[in-house]
Amino acid sequence: MAAAAVAADSKIDGLRDAVAKLGEISENEKAGFISLVSRYLSGEAEQIEWSKIQTPTDEVVVPYDTLAPPPEDLDAMKALLDKLVVLKLNGGLGTTMGCTGPKSVIEVRNGFTFLDLIVIQIESLNKKYGCSVPLLLMNSFNTHDDTQKIVEKYSNSNIEIHTFNQSQYPRIVTEDFLPLPSKGQTGKDGWYPPGHGDVFPSLNNSGKLDTLLSQGKEYVFVANSDNLGAIVDIKILNHLIHNQNEYCMEVTPKTLADVKGGTLISYEGRVQLLEIAQVPDEHVDEFKSIEKFKIFNTNNLWVNLKAIKRLVDAEALKMEIIPNPKEVDGVKVLQLETAAGAAIRFFEKAIGINVPRSRFLPVKATSDLLLVQSDLYTLVDGYVIRNPARVKPSNPSIELGPEFKKVANFLARFKSIPSIVELDSLKVSGDVSFGSGVVLKGNVTIAAKAGVKLEIPDGAVLENKDINGPEDI
């Protein structure tokens, strides 16, 4: 054990010396990085004792339906909202969907991007209640320059938009535990953003946290910019202020699509996030069971700003470290990350709120884009609202082949988005394209044979069909 400690010390000393010479990042970033790596090397990650896990009670994970209605008085509503800040995590690129630049500028519906919809929502909120809810965007070094240009188009809106960067940390070369940028990798590939757990120190280091506190702001609503369901909810805000909860995680019931999502547990008297990576191998199936662990983290988080300041200043936010091994130009590297949801256990009176599924509508792939661009949803004041004509509570399951993976290819294969209000499942593979006015119902599978181009004609109605060629339509 002593030998391992010595090895860890020499690793950290070598890394510290090399990082000190990196001119691209601030002293705060260097200190944060070294602190993260030291925690990782000390192996302080505690194993969860499975027998100590308890299912949270309704006091800890509050059912949304039991929340008190917000005040009806407009002045009282304004007073509540004036304590709020909205923060969107804007560090991700649209590369997985074949787009360049920040993911938040992908067009979602009616020509509006994720960012457009967010701005329209907050504008209508500020106008309706006469309040001043600011929007913060946490960028990464990957999205910063593009985002700065993009937000200029909102300069005439009635909202204050602040941008700040999350930390930039060097990737570590696995072989000798030195930073990749100090070994000649001068481009962006030498660096990484260390996960959204970094939102708390970065908010503080940027000076934004002090500014917001001086303006009388009390809570920040943090959400992924690609979650179209993450809209301001006055009922939740009212509950947190009334009960002085320093932290709230929105959770929602698991479906079979969400079995890998983190869940909330009661553990040694505190509420905490349990991720699949922390689960001992022999309990993974139990973790995935919808019977025992019924809820998962939406990553919609509401956090008290004074509490963030207190905990960041005390360096108390020691979230579980997620090691993420990668390869850059054939070199094996390690990046260490943390998640914002894991911070829940450090805050006082932390709770979960079990919210309707409508508050979790992420767009991670073109199959999600098909859902939100279809007649399953409508757009009102920037809000994506579910069509009441859909009887089933769950959305249809949609699987699109690799031909649809990139947004440009996806759009080229649909003359118009089909009607899917009565669809249960859709599976498409091969060279398939859709005409306009197509209606899909029940369970539909469309598989074009290799080398065959399959076109679904205009106005086709497909109900419970298995299509392998034009003769099956």
Curated annotation (Swiss-Prot):
GO terms for cellular component: cytoplasm. It is found in: Cytoplasm. It comes from the Eukaryota. It is an enzyme of class 2 (transferase). This is UTP--glucose-1-phosphate uridylyltransferase. Substrate binds at G91, G92, H196, N224, S225, D226. Plays a central role as a glucosyl donor in cellular metabolic pathways. GO terms for molecular function: UTP:glucose-1-phosphate uridylyltransferase activity. Keywords: Cytoplasm, Nucleotidyltransferase, Transferase. Transmembrane segments: none annotated. One of its GO terms (biological process) is UDP-alpha-D-glucose metabolic process. InterPro entries: Nucleotide-diphossugar_trans, UDPGP_fam, UDPGP_trans. UTP binds at L89, N90, G91, G92, K103, Q166, G195, D226, K364. The lineage of its organism: Eukaryota, Viridiplantae, Streptophyta, Embryophyta, Tracheophyta. Its EC number is 2.7.7.9. Belongs to the UDPGP type 1 family. The keyword Nucleotide-binding does not apply. Its main location: cytoplasm. It catalyses: alpha-D-glucose 1-phosphate + UTP + H(+) = UDP-alpha-D-glucose + diphosphate. Gene3D superfamilies: Hexapeptide repeat proteins (2.160.10.10), Spore Coat Polysaccharide Biosynthesis Protein SpsA, Chain A (3.90.550.10). PANTHER family: PTHR43511.
